[in-house]
Amino acid sequence: MARLLPGQRGRRGLLTVPRRRTKRRWLRWLLLLAVLDAAVFYWWWSNQAERRYNGIIREAAGEHGVEYALIKAVIWQESRFREDAVGDAGEIGLMQLMELAAFEWADDHGVHDFEHSHVYDPRTNILAGTYYLKTRLDRYRHTDNPLPYALADYNAGRARVVRWAREAARTNSTAFLQNIDFSSTRRYIDQVTHRRDHYQ
């Protein structure tokens, strides 16, 4: 029987180490493939979700005179196209609409028997949300650029916009943006604006 020199392993030890390495290598490859598969599926699902509401968004854009790309950007920012999304403050659906705003739309458009559950309907949510966005854009039409004011109002509310829109910022959007002391609202405006450019 051959003697082993110090530091040498028997035949079984020599075979076991490469097998373990091969197993680990295969596991790494399988894990990598699983991650890539999940990423491709997520990309495909996201694109499908974004396209699903294009017809309704076009309808809302035509009805209310709001840019198609802007409506789509607000939906992306608010809910990532999840029609069952519910916000911490009770915002509902694709455009994260407050119930009161939805009822205002229903009243203005003569929609009878309007109920809370109707706000979850994608078409109703997009039409009512676009109507609400349009009223905000109209509210600040006297400014050099109504968009940041309207988005700030949509995100943070009228009272905060009034506080930020003082002196020159009343009509100057650059000054207005500098006055916004909520980083989340500044980020919201920036992300919606960039996403709108992406959809144009």
Residues covered by each model-derived region:
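N-terminal Lys/Arg-rich, disordered targeting/topogenic segments
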Residues: 1-24
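Hydrophobic H-region at the start of alpha-helical membrane spans
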Residues: 24-34
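Export/targeting segments at the very N-terminus of extracytoplasmic proteins
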Residues: 34-84, 88, 106, 111, ...
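Soluble non-cytosolic domains of exported or imported proteins
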Residues: 51, 61, 65-69, 88, ...
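Solvent-exposed, polar/charged alpha-helical surfaces in well-ordered, non-transmembrane soluble domains
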Residues: 55-59, 68-72, 100-103, 127-134, ...
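Glycine-rich, acidic and aromatic/proline-enriched surface loops and short helix-turn segments
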Residues: 80, 99-107, 156-160
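Substrate-binding/active-site groove segments that recognize
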Residues: 89-112, 128-132
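Catalytic and substrate-binding regions of cell-wall glycan-acting enzymes that process beta-1,4-linked
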Residues: 148-200
